[in-house]
């Protein structure tokens, strides 16, 4: 029997502070709950949306009920008894960090149980010897930044100086990351990628998870904006991924949409598609749902919830994007094939109402749809790896080292 799996990952879409949130300073964080509360109280009204958060198709998959189980309260405006078509759970992260790579790797069978390297100083963040080595190997004459920063704010603050000097902008965050911003046309995209490749080689031994190229365009502070040509250089996963097992045992296709391939350092990816906006990510995903052959795994990361709204503390924008996504989810559901398994999940939280601009340690929703899957609560998962283990079970693959299967199809004991 030919099967497909479709994974829709809403980057940063947490549903309540997890039991270890205190260790991360994240008690009280609840990305979905606090967005829903703001919407319900008309605090997220804008020219684009108003009133309570309207996500009928996500609710039908069990989003509200999953959040109720995770946070002990139903998001304001959600139905206590929706027309449920999906099976739902919520998951606690096992990995030691709350970053994108840790969450993604864990759900495919490789939890991060070691500590990443970090640049903890808010200013003068990078050791001089590292900066000197990058300069020596890449022949750059100087650099700007060298601090913790918001990616959109730092190009406003330093973009004009960058155009004058052509010095790249180096910055970081609470995550294990080294980011380099440069003008796509004046500095050159190929030059930026080459610089990032060299920086990655230097930083990999320090267990810095990612070096990220952040190209932008524009001529002044008011017009600078990042382009879709972001590129992530990531450390390779330390354990075998579900993707690799699927290819080896079933000769499957693993289709990356958005930044999935970069997150997994291109390990186990057979096809990849880029997309610049939330609309484009939805378009490409729908195209693959319609056209990808059987024996495929389609995996999309919807990054804009995190990058454009979570980190930017934009509650109204996040709500509007969720409501748009929900309309496109309807199209995905309408185009699923007889034996498709749909999974909707997240990788961490990034509560736009919470203190600071960093990720938040939260439970994530784990929502499943298949025509033969009984709508029901599947319990709490102690690891995101339950997602990968459930996929392995569905596809008839060898089990992963981590996680448990959550699925029980109609007719099974």
Swiss-Prot record:
Q: Tell me which EC number(s) this protein carries.
A: 5.4.2.7
What is known about what this protein does?
Answer: Isomerase that catalyzes the conversion of deoxy-ribose 1-phosphate (dRib-1-P) and ribose 1-phosphate (Rib-1-P) to deoxy-ribose 5-phosphate (dRib-5-P) and ribose 5-phosphate (Rib-5-P), respectively.
Q: Which cofactor names does the annotation list?
A: Mn(2+)
Q: Which UniProt keywords apply?
A: Cytoplasm, Isomerase, Manganese, Metal-binding
What domain of life? Bacteria
**Name this polypeptide is given:** Phosphopentomutase
InterPro entries in the cross-refs = Alkaline_phosphatase_core_sf, DeoB, Metalloenzyme, Phosphopentomutase_DeoB_cap_sf
Q: How is the cofactor bound?
A: Binds 2 manganese ions.
One GO BP on record is: metabolic compound salvage
Q: Which organism is it from?
A: Helicobacter pylori (strain P12)
Any keyword Ubl conjugation? Answer: no
Could you tell me what reaction this enzyme catalyses?
2-deoxy-alpha-D-ribose 1-phosphate = 2-deoxy-D-ribose 5-phosphate; alpha-D-ribose 1-phosphate = D-ribose 5-phosphate
Gene symbol here is deoB
